[in-house]
Amino acid sequence: MGVAAVGAVAVAPSNSQIVWVGGGDQANARSSMSGDGVFKSTDAGKTWQPMGLPDSHHIARIVIHPKNPDIVYVAAMGHLFSRNEERGVFRTMDGGKTWKKVLYVNDGVGAIDLVINLKTPTQVFAALYDKERLPWQIVESGPESGVYRTDDGGEKWTRLTSGLPGGKIGRIGIDLFQKNPLILYALLENQNPKGASTGPVNSTSPLAQGIVGNELYRTDDGGKTWRKVSGDVNVAGGKAPDSFNQIKINPFNDQQVVVNSDSMFQTRDGGKTWTMDFM
């Protein structure tokens, strides 16, 4: 693989010899390196073959069907410094020989996260990210960032909006509680202004004084309705959007959620309180 950065790695649940890698930094920060598509190994990483999507540049997530390793979904952010059409969610049904773009909004919106329902693998959730880095400005949020769901393997997608904020939304991380797949968490970087404050500056969260910050939302009905569960806590300490990488639910306890950032943040009470463990 001739890439300087890797944004996603996935192992097929039904065959551990099959490994997929997506090139490019998924964080899209100041010094992000681009990649040249997705690569596949069928011998547990000994050898690799390029499998397409070279113009996607930044692959953020790869998910594989739990029983059929030929069905793969890829979340592509696209070019960092310019608009392009090879972004969104792509699907292959033949192990990477051919690809179909199944979720696409426009040439400035990429896909940043994916999660598949292991019990009903035709159901997939995706998070789209409205972002573009210009030479003179970083556009790191917008109205097209959102959470989507498909129930038919990617042919038709529905944007999930009830209870979720709109407007200037940045990066979104999602995870599904596989024991009860009606439960889904979404961590949203809410860049909408929160209004003027007369209180003291929070030295541990200097970037979040003028915006709402990172919020955790939960759905118990598969995304039909959402509620904020993080209260007034700025989850992940108000870090920049390129600082939190992934959100994960304890597979045995839906009250424990972990956010992977430059530190590890976790809640054991469904988002009410958080602890931070430096790494």
Model-derived segments and spans:
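Beta-propeller blade termini and top-face loops
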Residues: 1-279
